Amino acid sequence: MKEYCAATRTHGGRSTPDLSDMAEVEDTLKRIQAQHGVIGTIVVNGEGIPIRTTLDNSTSVQYAGLLHQLTMKARSAVRDIDPQNELTFLRIRSKKHEIMVAPDKEYLLIAIQNPSE
Amino acid sequence: MSNTTVTQKRRTLKVAKSSKTLNVSSGVFRPNQSTTKSINPLFSGKSFGSTGDSKVVDKISAQTPKHTAMVVDENGQDVTPHPLYNPDPGVLQSKQGKVFTALDTSLTTMTEFPSIAFQTTNASLTGPFTRSFFGSASASRISQTAESVTDETKDLLVKQDLSNSISDIQSHREEPKEQLRENILDSTANCYLSETETIWLLDIPAVSVSVESEDAEAVKERNNAYTELCKNRQGNDKYVERSMQTFSDASKTKEVQCDSITMVDKAVMCTVWDMYDSFNNISDVSANTVVSSERHEATIPESSSEGHLVHPKRSNQSLSVVSTVSTVSGSSTHIEKMACVLPLDEEPDLQLILQSDKLKQDLALMERVVLANVFQPKLAAYRQLPIIEDPDCVQMVMEEESWTEQSKNSHCPFLERLWDFSCELTMGRNVSCMVWNKKNPDLLAVGYGQVEFKNPNSGLVCCWSLKNPTWPDRVFHCESGVTALDFSASNANQLAVGMYDGTIAIYNVQTSEQTPITDSSDCANLHTSPVWQLTWIDHEDGLAADKGEILVSVSSDGRISKWIHYKSMECVDLMKLKIHDLQWKRHISSLTPGMCFDFHPNDSKIYLVGTEEGHIHKCSSSYNEQYLESYKAHKRPVYKVTWSPFCSDVFLSCSSDWTIQLWRQDLQIPVMGFTSGQRVVFDIMWSPHCATVFGAVSEGKVEIWDLRVSSLDPTLVNWTSPGVNPTALLFSPETDCVLVGDSEGQVTVYKLKNITAGGGSQGETLEDVIQSTLSSQH
């Protein structure tokens, strides 16, 4: 006999928070990397150091530095127009690639994709 | 008196040069019209004209002779005042005018003034008057010696000089002009002179008072009193004239050195959001920041202008930034302390980021964005949007061309495969049911579970989103195979799941929790056999308790039950499916298993039930004893029965006896039957767009029937790969796409091409078809 009630959500759902979260994050990163045409994914921490990357170190650091500055500028532009607004996503489409950046206060999530492959 | 040296010239041209004598009746005139401008200190603007019987010579009119003037009074005596001092030979003398002959006392006092004035006025005079000729005049003044004068008169003299000098300049200017014109003396030239408004450049009240004024007596008395006083105090020590001189000692150089003043360049970029943040953060500022708001603003932008993120405590480089800020704000000291501690803790920082919820959301978003790039043309086709070609991708264009060419060539309907929902979780599982979310048409719930008893394995419910065809948004693992699904319409996040062991669970798809909200395991009346179909029905009963949605299920134990869940699920039987046909009478129970049911789209009380014995019964939910009607045509279990969405009388049924039957609810025998091959038909569905179109899945193929075209053959047949059976069919309510679930766990999305909806009322079209069929039968 199982006892269920409406408040089951509060317990039992997240039994092992850290491990399952980490696994979920890793899984999602792997799936993104495995998608068609994705060249690399980088997770950069607040200091500009890549903490998860599928590219080589020098490229990762270069991307991290450049995109961080651009994201700051973009965020500044968005908030200048309306201070209650916030930048949520940034996409740069170039001739060869598309760079997608999801910014946050503590990290930067970057994915580079070549959609034409 | 032509020999008089008074060569005062009148301003008017009529006056001959030589014959000019100044008409001085009382000796009041302006003697000092020399270019070197002698100052008549006694004249001020006011006092000049105050002498009663003196004929006032206009300041301007008098011309200054180049040589020294002689003053002659009315008696012809030479009363030219002697200059107090003799200037340098090179400098022209300036004369002092003896204006008030009668005022000796005043004169004596006055005469002391000018010299002082000369010295002191040089600076002030050169100020307002920058004309070059006047510069020479001031030089001559400076050269005159000064005598000590009381301060108050000095100032007055200065001002007097200014006013006098104005006239001097003006007269000097006039002189060259006059000399030119004398040549044309004979001709009368009319010259209209007008006087401008008096421009007061300086106005010093007079210290000299005219003899004839009212105060003269008082002034005289005061002057006398003063002289008396001076005389009395001759020997008094307090009244001794003294002069002082300051010694200027020898100068000595002294060197001082101070610490180098460090110059720091500070730049702040003031942005709108920065001000907004600071304004909002003032209220949030903790006890750390004791600082004023200006400093608070200063710390935040400077860290951002350095190019770091707003969290300076995490940045090693920002340490240097903070240290150079000499404004020791409370927040910066706090940050310095933090920065000292943190560089050691790099690992937890990493973990924190990787576990944050925001990162998960961003990852999901990123995944969708990446997939949107990959699937863009397919999704556009799904949503019936024009497919935009990427100008940078040449390869894709070529593929597209070959693709579209094929479709253009053929005008017959065909299914264009867009994509399929599948992932490693679902591989190998049998798709048993699919249902769209009522509120979000992009959300699809697919149930995976076996339909036979062969391989009992755990079931799976996946909620797929159109935006991510590679991985389901939600995955719910169930204990037994899932056989029925339905989303609630009123609470769009509730998904009812019916399982092979008869359990019904309600999941909340908003969270990814694996436990359902409620479960029917506790219910006493729970189904003991697989639940083949579930529907949420909007009940319009009068009782308040029954209002809203209720869940109805049909199961192989022969019961149609209505489930109410407050705290736990309870069910009430709507109908028990009694066996009609003796042939099918079972010994175990008197009920025949129900396989499917469908509520009438317009009337939620009437519903059809398909049973395992092949009968279809029309029942009413308010009458649970007897069937309203029975339709008997199928020989084998009826797998699906469905009302037409356009015609309220027409319904369709499919069975494992290889046939699909079209019924009208008033006729006991089916109007039309469809069969194509000897294959079990698993699922059928009316097209939500076209009344005469329905789809069917049978072993190995997907068929689309269009009754306008033909009722004998399907209009479209799509064969699946060998070994794979399509087991579920779902039309998309928004677009013209069909979803087919198969026994390998794939849900493929096809786009229906070249099937036109047709004009006219949909229901009428179908009815026409039926009518024509009926008439042709008789």
Curated annotation (Swiss-Prot), chain B:
Top-rank taxon, per record: Eukaryota
Keyword set, alphabetical order: Cell projection, Cilium, Cytoplasm, Cytoskeleton, Flagellum, Repeat, WD repeat
Disruption phenotype: Morpholino knockdown results in ciliopathy-related phenotypes, such as curved bodies, hydrocephalus, abnormal otolith, randomized left-right asymmetry, and pronephric cysts, accompanied with paralyzed pronephric cilia.
Chief place where the protein resides: cytoplasm
Subcellular location as annotated: Cytoplasm, Cytoskeleton, Flagellum axoneme; Cytoplasm, Cytoskeleton, Cilium axoneme; Dynein axonemal particle
Protein name: Dynein axonemal intermediate chain 4
WD repeat residue numbers: 477-517, 526-573, 586-629, 633-673, 676-715, 721-760
Function (record text): Plays a critical role in the assembly of axonemal dynein complex. Plays a key role in ciliary motility.
